[in-house]
């Protein structure tokens, strides 16, 4: 529940609004029972316990990188389904990457998360739990959130928007919108809706190819919203929000790494203030795809920068603990 919804629920019980704030604060400190909320009267705690339950995911598996301390969680949800989240440590703070769905309907060829398709969309509380319990279990204060785990966040638009409202609340975890990144494979209608909300988060668009022919081969979504249609929506988003878009670009040998594609990408992103985040392909056996060579990646980056487009190579974290999103869930469920 949002704080406003919780206040309405307490008003219906004849309780003052400040009681809702107390419960909201308890929940965001990780309370897993109403009995633990000691600043509430016992009768109120009993009433709440009879009307509601507090959900808590359990750790099905946890991996800690020996290389950099990255922590990968596989959470078992109330219905037995599993999702992943990853805690990454940086000099500027700790970031958690969370999932938005169980499985994914988008079918991107290079991604393990989409194998098996969509099972269901996560509730706002299940999104929040990944942040909260990753923080509590790891002991690391979370300052940044990226919605780049399993699932397509904009396919779960309403629940993700409710989650953002809750996690941004000053009475809860109070994580600022500018510390939140949301990734999409390019659902144009939802990008347009997101622009109208002007949330000041960072939008990351999984582009992965600048031309329709190669992008359609690896990303089925391109058949509905081709590259130029997607980039037009991105330009409108930038104009309305003033927020620079980060374009995710997986470097795939023979698919998306040619000098000609680098030139085309630079041309199509001109004037957008865009940033390209180049990502070496993580191995997904079923895809039959391979990452680009270091030489090809350096050449691609140089061409972008020579044409006025900023580009960085994503730092690889947790490479020894199933770094590819969706891999841990697949291995766990296949055993």
Predicted stretch roles:
Residues 135-312:
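Conserved AdoMet/S-adenosylmethionine-binding subsite of the radical SAM
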Residues 82-87:
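A short loop-to-beta-strand scaffold at the N-terminal edge of the catalytic core in hydrolase folds
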Residues 89-126:
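Canonical Radical SAM [4Fe-4S] cluster-binding loop centered on the CxxxCxxC motif
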Residues 65, 99-100, 113, 183, ...:
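Short linear Ser/Thr-Pro motifs
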Residues 1-81, 235-244, 249-335:
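Auxiliary Fe-S-binding modules of radical SAM enzymes
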Residues 66, 78, 89-91, 186, ...:
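A generic beta-sheet turn/junction motif
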Residues 114-144:
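Conserved alpha-helical substructure of the radical SAM core
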């Amino acid at each position: 529940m949002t704080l406003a919804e919780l206040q309405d629920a307490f008003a219906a019980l004849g309780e003052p609004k400040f009681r809702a704030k107390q419960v909201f604060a308890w929940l965001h400190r990780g309370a897993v029972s109403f009995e633990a909320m000691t600043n509430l009267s016992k009768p109120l705690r009993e009433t709440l316990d009879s009307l509601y339950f507090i959900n808590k995911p359990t750790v099905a598996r946890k991996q800690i990188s020996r290389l950099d301390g990255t922590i990968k969680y596989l959470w078992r949800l109330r219905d037995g389904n599993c999702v992943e989240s990853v805690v990454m440590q940086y000099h500027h703070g700790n970031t958690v990457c969370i999932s938005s769905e169980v499985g994914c309907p988008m079918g991107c060829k290079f991604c393990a998360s989409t194998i098996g398709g969509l099972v269901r969309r996560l509730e706002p509380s299940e999104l929040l739990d990944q942040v909260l319990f990753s923080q509590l279990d790891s002991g690391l204060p979370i300052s940044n959130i990226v919605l780049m785990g399993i699932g397509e966040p904009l396919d779960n638009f309403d629940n993700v928007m409710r989650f953002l409202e809750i996690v941004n609340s000053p009475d809860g975890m109070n994580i600022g919108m500018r510390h939140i990144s949301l990734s999409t494979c390019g659902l144009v209608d939802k990008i347009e809706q997101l622009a109208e909300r002007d949330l000041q988060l960072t939008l990351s668009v999984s582009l992965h190819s600048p031309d329709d022919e190669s992008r359609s081969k690896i990303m089925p979504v391109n058949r509905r919203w081709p590259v130029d249609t997607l980039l037009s929506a991105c330009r409108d988003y930038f104009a309305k929000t003033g927020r620079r878009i980060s374009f995710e670009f997986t470097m795939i040998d023979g698919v998306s790494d040619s000098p000609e594609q680098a030139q085309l990408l630079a041309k199509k992103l001109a004037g957008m203030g865009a940033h390209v985040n180049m990502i070496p392909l993580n191995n997904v056996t079923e895809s039959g795809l391979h990452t680009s060579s270091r030489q090809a990646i350096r050449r691609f980056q140089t061409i972008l920068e020579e044409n006025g487009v900023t580009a960085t190579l994503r730092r690889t974290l947790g490479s020894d603990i199933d770094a590819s999103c969706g891999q841990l869930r697949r291995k766990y469920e296949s055993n």
